[in-house]
UniProtKB/Swiss-Prot annotation:
Homodimer. Part of the ribosomal stalk of the 50S ribosomal subunit. Forms a multimeric L10(L12)X complex, where L10 forms an elongated spine to which 2 to 4 L12 dimers bind in a sequential fashion. Binds GTP-bound translation factors. The keyword Protein transport does not apply. Keywords: Ribonucleoprotein, Ribosomal protein. Forms part of the ribosomal stalk which helps the ribosome interact with GTP-bound translation factors. Is thus essential for accurate translation. GO terms for cellular component: cytosolic large ribosomal subunit. The keyword Lipid biosynthesis does not apply. Signal peptide: none annotated. This is Large ribosomal subunit protein bL12. GO terms for biological process: translation. It comes from the Bacteria. It comes from Mycolicibacterium paratuberculosis (strain ATCC BAA-968 / K-10) (Mycobacterium paratuberculosis).
Length: 130
């Protein structure tokens, strides 16, 4: 395979769906044994690790934000979805909202999941955090 420039890679990513990008990130992490988690998530998990070992093992550190329905204010929900999910175009955001229930964010920190849920609910959506 020919070497791709950064611009070529970005163009290829722009054409991918959110789920395809998520799969790509997972495979990239596995292949290169790295993580794409934000440094904030690591800092937030730090104090929990200092507590009792049994509690740290049971406490969930990664959450999925699932859009159950858009409600009556679909346009507002689409705007918030574009804000929350980086790099998402208007058509992709609309398709995501129309296809609910769909996962919007996967394996994010609790603060990010709660923030996304609050924004989506304020826009009129029904959201579940798992």
């Amino acid at each position: 395979m020919a070497k791709m420039s950064t611009d070529d890679l970005l163009d290829a990513f722009k054409e991918m769906t959110l789920l395809e990008l998520s799969d790509f990130v997972k495979k990239f992490e596995e292949t290169f044994e790295v993580t794409a988690a934000a440094p904030v998530a690591v800092a937030a998990a730090g104090p929990a690790a200092g507590g009792a070992p049994a509690e740290a093992a049971e406490e969930q550190s990664e959450f999925d934000v699932i859009l159950e329905s858009a409600g009556d204010k679909k346009i507002g929900v689409i705007k918030v979805v574009r804000e929350i999910v980086s790099g998402l175009g208007l058509k992709e955001a609309k398709d995501l909202v129309d296809g609910a229930p769909k996962p919007l964010l996967e394996k994010v920190a609790k603060e990010a999941a709660d923030d996304a849920k609050a924004k989506l609910e304020a826009a009129g959506a029904t959201v579940t955090v798992k």
